[in-house]
Curated annotation (Swiss-Prot):
Domain of life: Eukaryota
Notes on activation and inhibition: May be regulated by calcium ions.
Main localization category: mitochondrion
Name of the protein in its database record: Magnesium transporter MRS2 homolog, mitochondrial
Record-linked Gene3D superfamilies: 2.40.128.330, Magnesium transport protein CorA, transmembrane region (1.20.58.340)
A molecular-function term among this protein's GO annotations: magnesium ion transmembrane transporter activity
Transmembrane segments: 340-359, 371-401
Role played: Magnesium transporter that mediates the influx of magnesium into the mitochondrial matrix and regulates magnesium metabolism. Also permeable to calcium, sodium and potassium ions. Required for normal expression of the mitochondrial respiratory complex I subunits. May play a role in maintaining the inner mitochondrial membrane potential.
Residues reported in the UniProt entry to bind Mg(2+) 2: G329
Domain notes: The GMN motif acts as an ion selectivity filter.
Record InterPro entries: MRS2-like (IPR039204)
Quaternary structure (record): Homopentamer.
Upper taxonomic lineage: Eukaryota, Metazoa, Chordata, Craniata, Vertebrata
Residues where Mg(2+) 1 binds: E243, T246, D247, E312
Length: 443
């Protein structure tokens, strides 16, 4: 009863409280319910304690704060448990390989990067963050530091042979890398760019023979009709070629963006800013920015060659498409011409068939009595139809013939001889004047 009496005083205060605090208080009030068989004194004490809790606004704030604190703890624990785990493969300067798993939060804290820097993107890019080089190549992500190379999440990829056989030897200097005398990041960048160029070259070498074989089969003049299965294969190969052209274009644009900015070239030389000895060598004679520019220009040239080869294939596909359309148009013209010839034959036959219609009427004449009249009339009908059909075909042939090129008007022989004689006279006059002048000058 005391609790009920205090409700009118507490309602205005409760309306000002947030909804979460009210829910917490409601759960607190209903969590411990007194038993039904409790004594009256115990019920009275419980009612007074609940009323005292309701009457103290400070307790309300504390309860709300405790509830919010518990919620934040639970959310942080949930986020920590759901944080992605990277499988990291580490390569040092000597080519030693170590693999381990690390959470994303721990990894970017160790590297001094932001969370957005380790976000996966399917677009090729080369960026520098906090003296770290981040290279993204569709499904491959690498972080290059002055001391090591980190490959992130190579799982479910066919990279084991390249990662564990070729890459360590290239980084340690045993491979055929041009940048072996330069700092470690040059070798790492060259190895990754070489791998990506080889991947694009492999895709092109697979597509090129398939496309050429399909085009040869479609453009072959021995086949009068076009095979639909070959067209479907050509369509699929054309889509793959378009994807390859897009990959090459993105690769070229990403490298060209770095080549256009001198600051980016300087930032890619991470050992220059972390190692004093490398900085002294760069200041003394070896310009690392120029070496990086030459390296990127070399791979840009290789990508440009791949782009030209892919463009040639695209031109061949377009030319073959026009040839296929021409062949289809010629076949369609042949069918239309045949249809027109049959129509003219039907017209000529029906025109002379009127003679048979006249004999089929119920008219009496003396011609039916002669047995030779039937064969005579039939012969006249077929001969007349054949003659008219031939005339119509000759008319159609004259109309469909290609027009001859205009003939050039030929000059008569007399004018040509006159022109030659005039040229000879002029040359003789010039020679005579020249000899006379020479004699005068000698005298």
């Amino acid at each position: 009863m005391e609790c009920l009496r205090s409700l009118p005083c507490l309602l205005p205060r409760a309306m000002r409280l947030p909804r979460r605090t009210l829910c917490a208080l409601a759960l607190d009030l209903t969590s411990v319910a007194p038993p039904v068989a409790a004594s009256g004194r115990r019920a009275n004490l419980i009612g007074r304690s609940r009323a005292a809790q309701l009457c103290e606004p400070g307790r309300l704030r504390v309860a709300g704060e405790v509830h919010r604190f518990r919620t934040s703890d639970v959310s942080q624990a949930t986020l920590a448990s759901v944080a992605p785990v990277f499988t990291v493969t580490k390569f040092d300067k000597q080519g030693n390989v170590t693999s381990f798993e690390r959470k994303k939060t721990e990894l970017y804290q160790e590297l001094g990067l932001q969370a957005r820097d380790l976000r996966f993107q399917h677009v090729m890019s080369i960026t520098v963050r906090n003296n770290r080089i981040i290279m993204r190549m569709e499904y491959l992500k690498a972080v290059i530091t002055p001391e090591c190379l980190l490959i992130l999440d190579y799982r479910n990829l066919n990279l084991e042979q390249w990662l564990f056989r070729e890459l360590p030897s290239q980084l340690s200097g045993e491979g055929q890398l041009v940048t072996y005398p330069l700092p470690f990041e040059f070798r790492a960048i060259e190895a990754l760019l070489q791998y990506w160029i080889n991947t694009l070259q492999g895709k092109l070498s697979v597509l090129q023979p398939l496309i050429l074989e399909t085009l040869d089969a479609l453009v072959d003049p021995k086949h009068s009709s076009v095979d639909k299965s070959k067209l479907h294969i050509l369509l699929q190969n054309g889509k793959s070629l378009s994807e390859l052209e897009t990959d090459i274009k993105i690769f070229k644009e990403s490298i060209l963006e770095i080549l256009d900015e001198e600051e980016l070239l300087e930032e890619l030389c991470v050992s220059k800013w972390s190692d004093p000895q490398v900085f002294e060598k760069s200041s003394a004679g070896i310009d690392h920015a120029e070496e990086m520019e030459l390296l990127l220009e070399n791979y840009y040239r290789l990508a440009d060659d791949l782009s030209n080869a892919a463009r040639e294939l695209r031109v061949l596909i377009d030319d073959s498409q026009s040839i296929i359309f021409i062949n289809l148009g010629s076949h369609r013209n042949v069918m239309m011409r045949l249809n027109l010839q049959l129509t003219m034959g039907t017209f000529s036959l029906s025109l002379f068939g009127l003679m048979g219609v006249a004999f089929g009427m119920n008219l009496e004449s003396s011609l039916e009595e002669d047995h030779r009249i039937f064969w005579l009339i039939t012969g006249i009908m077929f001969m007349g139809s054949g003659l008219i059909w031939r005339r119509l075909l000759s008319f159609l042939g004259r109309q469909l013939e290609a027009p001859l090129p205009p003939m050039m008007a030929s000059l008569p022989k007399k004018t040509l001889l006159a022109d030659r004689s005039m040229e000879l006279k002029n040359s003789l006059r010039l020679d005579g004047l020249g000899s006379g002048r020479s004699i005068l000058t000698n005298r």
